[in-house]
Amino acid sequence: MKYQLLDVARGNRFLSRPREDPTATIIEDDTSSTTNSPYGSDWDIIWLGHCGSYSDPDTRRFVLKNDPTVPRVSDIMYPAGSPEPEELWKQPGTRIMYKSGNGVCSWTYAVSFVGAQKLLNAMSIEPFNQGFDQGLGRLCSSGILRCTHIFPPIFGAHAPAGGANRESDITGHRAGTKIREKGRTHNVLWSTRLNIKNILEGKKVEAQWDGVPDLNDEMKREFIP
């Protein structure tokens, strides 16, 4: 998780720069920049867990390559949409970060102080009659919130073993009496929920899909703007 959020911080600082900024095409550590946060200061939402998103007109992409925690493309679920260009994130071991135009499913998100103020205003003072995640997506697409997405997402919803209707309070009724033999965590290769017993017993964590190489202790990361 620390490795992943370090990558997210670098990507968010890159995307927070003005588009006309000539240094926005250069990846650097940014540790000399004046900021109150490792994630930068010019953002409202970092959407880390979702079930799909679309990019806004900003065509910049921060590409994270050689990430062993990225699921295979065949294992990724994104029913609500995916960003362009697909050829970037469909490369093995690759995630991309981008300025988001919309998103669905508020599984995990970070909010800046200013972003929290904007959310409170939008959802309590201004007219608001949507589900939270749909409303959050609308606030991103309208430009009220400055939002960054990562795809494939780092966090996913967990569907436990047992009755499939337990998966969601919204859509669980559609599952009827179907039984899920094994739990699953959407878009997470090494799921903490599925590995709780292994973690408690000091054993190696297991991927939730077959045919995945073991996770090395060290992640060798590469960044491409």
Give the role of each language-model region.
Residues 2-225:
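An acidic/histidine-cluster motif and surrounding catalytic segment
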